[in-house]
Amino acid sequence: MEVTPGEARYLLSIFDLVRDGVKLSQSGLARRLGVSDPTALQMIRRLRQLGLVESAGLNLTSAGTSAALGLGHRRQAARVLALDVLGLDAEQADTEARRLAPAVSSALAQRLMRLRSARD
């Protein structure tokens, strides 16, 4: 499932927070993303309508988890591009990878990861 960059940002943030064992709240997510509570609520509602977030709480559905895993793979590939090809430092690479992940296709992600493997 393709998602917008905004949807991707929320999915990846929810996924990362859950993976790190952080108790999620709408306000905590809003703070992490630097948006207002109403803005976060609007996006959470949209993600629920898309079937990516459960109707109660901030847990990803199986479709949401699948989408987040795919985005995570693309984020890692974008990080490889930023670090290995563009020579950015780790912090810059992470920032750019978060921005680029929604725009990186699965095919490009696979090629970037192969490029890294070939260099290692």
Please give the residue ranges for each predicted region.
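Short amphipathic alpha-helical interface segments
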Residues: 7-22
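Short amphipathic alpha-helical interaction segments
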Residues: 33-49
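Basic, amphipathic "hinge/linker" alpha-helix immediately C-terminal to the N-terminal HTH DNA-binding motif
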Residues: 57-75
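Short acidic, hydrophobic short linear motifs in intrinsically disordered regions
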Residues: 20-32
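A short, conserved structural fragment
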Residues: 48-58
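Short alpha-helical segments that sit at the start of domains
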Residues: 1-11, 114
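Amphipathic alpha-helical dimerization/coiled-coil segments
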Residues: 77-120
